[in-house]
From Swiss-Prot:
The keyword Flavoprotein does not apply. It comes from Neisseria gonorrhoeae (strain ATCC 700825 / FA 1090). This is Ribosomal protein uL3 glutamine methyltransferase. Methylates large ribosomal subunit protein uL3 on a specific glutamine residue. Disulfide bonds: none annotated. One of its GO terms (molecular function) is nucleic acid binding. Gene3D superfamilies: DNA helicase RuvA subunit, C-terminal domain (1.10.8.10), Vaccinia Virus protein VP39 (3.40.50.150). Keywords: Methyltransferase, S-adenosyl-L-methionine, Transferase.
Length: 299
């Protein structure tokens, strides 16, 4: 099929149609940036051809050079056959207006937390200038640390990960955004060895339960398992965060954690904690907020 496509397809429109059919035939999972075969194909084609990602229409009937067609079809075939997430093929992932370098040393950024930084944390953080020190636990690619630096211009940020490989990727992104003086990368397991206190702690920790890890679509198998699974019920990392966070929060400090689909399990495990569930594009059951006072049972 690949050789036939290389011979008969001539325009971007042709290649796009072929890619959508190929992706549907392959039964791909979409959830690392796009949610359907068409958008995934558009992204891969435009990126590979170095065209603006938001300008498909003017180029649909443009004819491809043989070398261009060969390169685009090779990317399409890798996506279809190997089920590699598109972000790993392009080494680029987007969150809002921010783009980040990614490879298979880190999960593809998809946390809802970035939607909440700034206005989404009012009234708990009334003014962005009140955040002077922030912590990103399980930083991965560094995407949340970088976005915190953007929203909180006076903040110094510690970005922590247990994976040295992940910290290398985070370092690439921090350098790309010129934030080396504001974001400190720390190799440790959650709070271990940390000495500072923070106005804001955010974390998108591993939260997939053991049964679900075994049933994940093939695309997720390209991501580091260390960043996905978290014990039998998916809460091992979250338990450690809840146990220790208060010691590292300033008096008016706020904790923000994403936990996937584990809201019911978490609330059953911690009936005494008054979780505030924040609305995101995914719904109101994925990210919780707790203040230091709530963690200490003082509110």
């Amino acid at each position: 099929m690949f050789n036939q496509a290389a011979q008969e397809l001539t325009t971007i429109r042709d290649v796009l149609r072929f890619a959508v059919s190929r992706f549907n035939e392959a039964g791909l999972f979409f959830g690392h940036g796009t949610d359907n075969a068409h958008d995934e194909a558009v992204y891969l084609i435009l990126h590979t051809l170095n065209l603006p990602l938001d300008m498909l229409a003017p180029y649909l009937d443009a004819k491809l050079l043989e070398a261009e067609k060969e390169e685009v079809l090779a990317v399409i075939e890798r996506r279809a056959v190997e089920h590699i997430p598109a972000a790993y093929l392009t080494h680029q992932a987007w969150q809002g207006e921010f783009d980040f370098y990614v490879d298979e040393r880190v999960i593809v950024p998809r946390s809802f937390i970035y939607e909440l930084l700034g206005d989404g944390l009012r009234p708990w953080i009334e003014y962005d200038e009140l955040v002077h020190n922030a912590l990103d636990l399980c930083t991965g690619s560094g995407c949340l640390a970088i976005q915190m630096a953007h929203h909180y211009p006076d903040a110094q940020i510690d970005a922590v990960d247990v994976s040295l490989d992940a910290l290398e990727v985070a370092g690439i992104n921090i350098e790309d955004y010129g934030l080396e003086e504001r974001i400190q990368l720390i190799h440790t397991d959650l709070f271990e060895g940390l000495e500072g206190t923070y106005d804001l702690i955010v974390s998108n920790p591993p939260y997939v339960d053991a049964e679900s890890v075994g049933a994940l679509p093939e695309e997720y198998l390209h991501e580091p398992e260390l960043a996905l699974g978290s014990g039998a019920d998916g809460l091992d990392a979250t338990r450690q965060i809840l146990l220790n966070a208060a010691k590292f929060l300033n008096p008016k400090g706020v904790l923000l954690v994403e936990i996937g689909h584990n809201r019911d399990v978490l609330e059953a495990a911690y009936p005494e904690l008054p979780f505030t569930w924040l609305e995101t594009s995914g719904g109101d059951g994925f990210v919780f907020l707790l203040t230091r006072e709530q963690l200490l049972g003082e509110e």
